[in-house]
Swiss-Prot record:
It comes from Bacillus cereus (strain G9842). PROSITE patterns: PHOSPHAGEN_KINASE (PS00112), PHOSPHAGEN_KINASE_C (PS51510). This is Protein-arginine kinase. Pfam families: ATP-gua_Ptrans (PF00217). InterPro entries: Arg_Kinase, ATP-guanido_PTrfase, ATP-guanido_PTrfase_AS, ATP-guanido_PTrfase_cat, Gln_synth/guanido_kin_cat_dom. Appears to be allosterically activated by the binding of pArg-containing polypeptides to the pArg-binding pocket localized in the C-terminal domain of McsB. It catalyses: L-arginyl-[protein] + ATP = N(omega)-phospho-L-arginyl-[protein] + ADP + H(+). A motif (RDXXRA motif of the pArg binding pocket involved in allosteric regulation) lies at residues 337-342. The gene is mcsB. The keyword ATP-binding applies.
Length: 354
């Protein structure tokens, strides 16, 4: 696994495929929180204990293959620049919390769809990413990695409670399942607030694109379970999948309603956004995200021909501040970022059209 490859290829291999319901569901993620019995929680550990966990993983798991996942490499946060850490966050390979830790690290698969974060809130957090609605498949992969690690270490586990975690809401299965979902129809019809209220009453959480505390840029929301105690992994997945399928139906109905009642207004909105993307010389990340959302909707509804939906997904990643600066070879001021973002979008759309 090459750090240069990770940094220079903004689109992870797992993002290039189209999973089920990929017109609305961008990705599915499974995260398993685990702690080692012999160490204090990450929030209480000292430097020596953190280094011991690094060495344990370096000895037991680095450059070793498991199943069809290929070999894993280790990235230590204190060996990366702030910009490199930001790129990993923008590619959803690590959490913002891990990026801010001194003794954190990440075990990463060649395909980048599996990462094992070390010394975050818990000793390890296994993350599996799949395109589209593939929660069961992601859980299966996460369990394979979990079993692989558990052969070499002893987890903190209680027979009555389950896996012991730093945060009480993760005690039990330690499972956090989440789905990244694009909901422009519900936003445009002003139904999104009511939908979010219903989701929250069902015990689920709605966040922005980078998880807790982040903003829902480009009409993209992250829906996940909240409690992990008292339910099996399969039940958690089934409940979340059921809710997501209902949201998908609500989004499709909202899109149909807009087409029926406001078709010309929607078409105008889509093409105005396309015009901004295709012609702007300066564009901020929030405006780019909103315009990309409009154009993606236009592609899904058949207004715009000859442009792949995947290009929009690619541009959503490529135009993030960290990745833009990585491509530029170093830090950029806000206006320089806006200029490069606009240039990149124009060039990419021009290539796609031709």
């Amino acid at each position: 696994m090459s750090l240069d490859k990770i940094m220079n290829e903004a689109i992870s291999p797992w993002m290039k495929g189209d999973g089920p319901d990929s017109d609305i569901v961008l990705s599915s993620r499974i995260r398993l929180a685990r702690n080692f019995k012999q160490y204090q929680f990450s929030t209480m550990q000292n430097e020596e204990e953190a280094k011991q966990i690094h060495e344990l993983f370096k000895k037991k798991f680095i450059n070793k293959a498991v199943g069809s996942f290929g070999e894993f490499g280790l990235l230590k946060m204190n060996e990366l620049t702030p910009l490199q850490r930001r790129v990993l966050v923008e590619k959803h390979l690590i959490s913002p919390n891990l990026a801010g830790t001194e003794y954190g690290a990440c075990l990463l698969s060649e395909s980048e769809h599996i990462s094992v974060m070390l010394n975050e809130e818990d000793h390890i957090r296994i993350q599996c990413l799949f395109s589209g609605l593939q929660l069961s498949e992601a859980l299966q992969s996460a369990n394979q990695i979990d079993n692989w690690i558990e052969k070499e270490v002893e987890y903190a586990f209680d027979e009555s409670l389950g896996y012991i975690t730093s945060c009480p809401t993760n005690v039990g299965t330690g499972l956090r399942a989440s789905v990244m979902i694009h909901l422009p129809g519900l936003v445009l019809t002003k139904r999104i607030s009511r939908i979010i209220q219903v989701i929250q009453k069902l015990g689920l959480v709605v966040r922005g694109i980078y998880g807790e505390g982040s903003e829902a840029l480009g009409n993209i929301f992250q829906v996940s379970n909240q409690m992990t105690l008292g339910k099996s992994e399969e039940d958690i997945i089934a409940d979340l999948k059921s809710v997501i399928q209902q949201i998908i139906q609500q989004e499709k109905m909202a899109r149909e309603l807009i087409v029926q009642n406001s078709s010309i207004e929607l078409e105008d909105k889509v093409y105005r956004s396309y015009g901004i993307l295709a012609n702007s010389r300066l564009i901020q990340s929030a405006e780019a995200a909103n315009c990309l959302s409009d154009v993606r909707l236009g592609i899904d509804l058949g207004y715009i021909k000859g442009i792949s939906r995947n290009i929009l997904t690619e541009l959503m990643v490529l135009t993030q501040p960290g990745i833009l600066q990585q491509y530029a070879g170093g830090p950029l001021g806000p206006e320089e970022r806006d200029y490069r973002r606009a240039t990149l979008i124009r060039e990419r759309l021009s290539i796609e059209k031709n």
